């Protein structure tokens, strides 16, 4: 998906450094989500080994130093990954504002290496995640390359935008007061952890439904151009690439649904599609669904 070049990027809620403290667990997307939790706690595997098997080559992918001064227009979002992440956050905010009365924007932080959060310290091995304490979505953009080289995703800009929309989906859950369910009997293919992540996938699909029609208030220009078939394929590939079953099979050679916390590849694809086809966040009630797919 390509941003319209006339869109103006708002970086006012985005930072690239800072610290915090706390003890609550951050909530991950499962494809950007807290891989430390998914891999290490559930599978008994060092996440550092998984994420560092291949070197990253982002020379033509990231402008150096997370320089947000380069993020001015949609053209910059199409060129630089950090600008694309910020612009996607702008788009997701614009979509949710009319859908959820009282919606407030989350903060966004771009980081590399180590970062302090309201949920405690984190590292680049964590990947993108959302912390409900400071209401901030954290993104290490190197993860998008890892998603391709380590997990077999097809990549593409819309796969990256989907990850952002998923983490913002956790913010929506936080505003609705349902995010805490992730900590209640979190494991298992039908557990609350899986239901929480699948709902965030569905919310990402809802964003995709509106992404090319919702206009920026200040310019009157839609944030994004219409979705292509490849965009959807890239999002579905990203969702599937780090489904619990895919990660377990890759890491241990077997799958164990009793330890799932994020959902299978098929489940994640299903719920993104549900949101994308309907544009109705009420359909995303995974907590009441008898069949998660």
From Swiss-Prot:
Keywords: Membrane, Transmembrane, Transmembrane helix
Ranges of biased composition (kind: Polar residues): 248-265
UniProt-annotated location(s): Membrane
Protein name: Uncharacterized protein Rv2575
Parts forming coiled coils: none
GO cellular component, one term: extracellular region
Keyword presence, Manganese: no
Residue ranges crossing the lipid bilayer per the database entry: 25-45
Membrane topology listed for this record: Single-pass membrane protein
């Amino acid at each position: 998906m390509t941003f319209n070049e006339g869109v103006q990027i708002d970086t006012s809620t985005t930072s690239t450094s800072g610290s915090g403290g706390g003890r609550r667990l951050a909530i991950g997307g499962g494809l950007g989500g807290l891989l430390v939790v998914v891999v290490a706690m559930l599978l008994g595997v060092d996440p550092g080994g998984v994420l560092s098997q291949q070197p990253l080559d982002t020379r033509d992918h990231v402008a150096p130093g997370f320089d947000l001064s380069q993020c001015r227009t949609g053209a910059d979002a199409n060129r630089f990954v950090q600008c694309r992440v910020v612009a996607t956050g702008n788009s997701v905010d614009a979509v949710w504002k009319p859908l959820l009365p009282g919606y407030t924007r989350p903060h966004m932080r771009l980081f590399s290496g180590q970062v302090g959060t309201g949920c405690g310290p984190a590292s680049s091995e964590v990947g993108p995640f959302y912390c409900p304490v400071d209401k901030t979505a954290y993104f290490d953009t190197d993860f998008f390359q890892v998603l391709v080289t380590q997990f077999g995703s097809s990549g593409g800009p819309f796969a990256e935008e989907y990850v952002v929309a998923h983490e913002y989906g956790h913010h929506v859950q936080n505003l609705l007061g349902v995010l805490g369910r992730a900590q209640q009997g979190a494991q298992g293919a039908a557990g609350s952890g899986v239901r929480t992540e699948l709902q965030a996938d569905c919310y990402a699909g809802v964003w995709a439904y509106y992404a090319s029609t919702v206009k920026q208030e200040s310019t009157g220009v839609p944030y994004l151009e219409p979705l292509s078939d490849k965009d959807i394929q890239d999002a579905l590939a990203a969702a599937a690439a780090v489904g619990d079953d895919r990660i377990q099979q890759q890491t241990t050679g077997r799958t164990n649904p009793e330890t799932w916390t994020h959902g299978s590849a098929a489940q994640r694809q299903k719920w993104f599609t549900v949101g994308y086809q309907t544009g109705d966040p009420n359909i995303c009630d995974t907590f009441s669904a008898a069949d998660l797919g």
